[in-house]
Amino acid sequence: MSTFRIEEADRPHVIRLAILWVILSVIGVIAVLQIQIPPGDETVQGADQTRTLSLMTAMATPVFIGVVMMIIYSAIYFRRKGRELVDGPPMLGNAPVQVVWITVSTIMVLFLAFVGITELATNSSAQTVPGQSSGTAAAGGSEMQVQVIAQQWYFTYRYADYSGVETTHLYLPVDRPVELHVTSLDIIHSFWAYQLGVKADANPGVDNVFHVTPQKLGSFQVRCAELCGIWHGEMADSQGQVVSQSDFDSWIAQQQQDYAAIQKVVPSYAPFYFPLPLTKGS
Amino acid sequence: MVRRLSFTAAGVVIVIILVIAFVGLFMLRRPGTLEGTPTTIHLETVAAVGAANEWPRPDDPHPDWVGYLPTTILRVPANSTINMQIDQEDGATGLRNPFWGKVFGTEGGNMHMTYFDDKGNPQEGDMTSIDPTQAAHTFAIPDLGVFVPLLGVNSNAPAGSTNVITFSFKTKGPGIYHWQCFVPCAAKTVFGNGGPMQTLGYMAGELIVS
């Protein structure tokens, strides 16, 4: 193994690059940390995602700056002069440099993988529950169950803990863990409430479970993230709300009152539904 | 060689022009606009646009498609009360989501309907919901929170009968609001949501608020 040695002539370049890299990296990381990376902190899960994305972006910034800086620096200082076509000096491998480079890269990638997997395995855990037929929803647990039902071209919501009342907007109480059950009545949709940090496929016959805990009062948007027909672009709702528990209680009571008119003919709350006919006239 | 290249280049240019023309014509093709007088809209829903009672379109490229007539592009004033009358001539298909059997977002939270009961006798009344299995169509403007189910004509009603549904709703500020049917009423398409459900001028429409 050859020893790591810097040629005398290269030292000014190395020192210059190192100083420049440190300064630009510090500036870059500080700048990156000022960016409000979505989804934000409206939910515990969203805050975790934002934190993870910020960490990953901050770690990637010095690498990005180093690569771009080397390219620009080389293009300026090591530019071929004159019109004569001459091969550059032969470049042989430098084992110490390669060892450092591979080791540092491996440590960074493994660290980021550990952070990402840990994040996925804890706060933003999702669970898909394919089933065979409609049945009753799993009851109990401290989380409030809310079912998201996609259909061309609107989302409706059923609250299992409130006699399965169905609503046209999604209201969630603050500081209360929620278990979202996402399904579809027709084709594939995708429930995307990015401020909540949730993006879940809505597939017919599938109960796609996501967990979310709102921690800030405010509104959020819901939209479909799966191309689903002529009004896909309109399959959105900006009236999602995170409200206080007392406001939620008032709202859900009103919804239950309104729902009474149709409750008898709406099927019981189930993980998913298979309404018929699949083809009109078939 | 030059001649062959010229023919090839000319062919490519012609194909490109044809493709652009086809796409352009497709995108420019829109149904006409119905302007309220000034806040009243009268529509008709039929099982086949070629065989409607009031505004038949026998020359339509899809005369057997279900549709709203005379058009699905509606222009109405902003921040106004719109009085709707829908003459519903189609039979029941049923809702995929029974929840839409309830009336939402209308003035008074209800609709007025003349219809025919199971014995074929004419009936009339204000309603806040209908049996979801007996829905023929819905008139829904999701961004305005307006969802109105339209009862299918009873099979025991006299031939050519029409259910007349009237209701009012308020518009918001200027903008283009899509409206749609939640009944999967496109016959012989998967989930009943193909063809006319995906095409402006049949079961898909725009409410232009200006």
State where each predicted segment sits.
Chain B
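Extracytoplasmic entry segments of secretory-pathway proteins
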Residues: M1-S129
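Extracellular/periplasmic metallocenter environments
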Residues: G11, I20-R29, G109-D126, I130-S210
